[in-house]
Amino acid sequence: MMNMQIRMFVRQWTLAISMIAGISSYFILKWLPLGNDAHSLMLQGVHIVQPILIFLMLFLTFCRVHPSQLRLSRWQIWNLLLQTGMFLLLCLLLIIFPETSFRVEIEGALLCFICPTATAAVVVTSKLGGRAGTTTTYTLLINLCVAILVPLLVPAVHPQQGMTFTHAFCVVLSKVFPLLLCPIIAAELLRRISPSITSRLASYKDLPFHLWAIALALALAVTTRSLINSHVSVGVAAGVAVASLLACIIQFGIGRMAGSKYGDPISAAQSCGQKNTVFAIWMGYTFLTPVTSLAGGFYSIWHNVYNSWQLAQMKKKNTDAGAK
């Protein structure tokens, strides 16, 4: 009984536990007398492990999805136009006004808009009564768009010193494209080669969730390091928080509106609003101003708070209906 209660508590508060673990681990390691070499080695380790975790999360998710489950809908077009359109607009702003005093906030917002759908979105969509097939299809579509657009525009938005656009494009492409598309290809190949192994992997339903918790903790440790070392002001941090909140409200709101037109508001809202924030954090500290990775951390709070509220409302509604 006690073990069950502990498991329920950990699962219910995984977000908070991961965030606290990630933030506190940075300060603990900083205070330990390990030396700069050890700290640098651990940071390099995180940079290697983080993409692997993201890859595995996506791979295990796509192992559970059979091509016959995929469903196209017109709302997916509107969601794609919103995400890619806002990303293009914000990139254009930074290219035209590179010295703007709101650069960090704009970078944070563009991260939140282009960030692909979370692997957990299918689960939440199903619990809220939406269609898992259309959500999964949108996850594939937005991953394809991100894999193409990010390498094309990020080098122009945040040029690397001493690196040509072509070189920067190839560097970003080599990191983003395999990370988002290889899990899809690998899952489909495994399904064709060994359906039994694919089914076995798909049976571990909680594994992507646990990998996400580890990846989130590592991402927040790196984000905390970036925040401390950048000496960013409270005002800038608050600006990034507001930018991520607005991006969250806009995407959930417009996603729901688009889905309502085609009888699928829950799936459309979750597909557009629930994000793979670990990817956003990784992209922020890897390709943009490191402090912009805060946007992913804040967004993780906003979308999880909103979904927790939705699930609580649904549970209350079902309880009331059962009482009648």
Predicted regions, residues:
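Alpha-helical transmembrane segments of multi-pass small-molecule/ion transporters
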Residues: 1-324
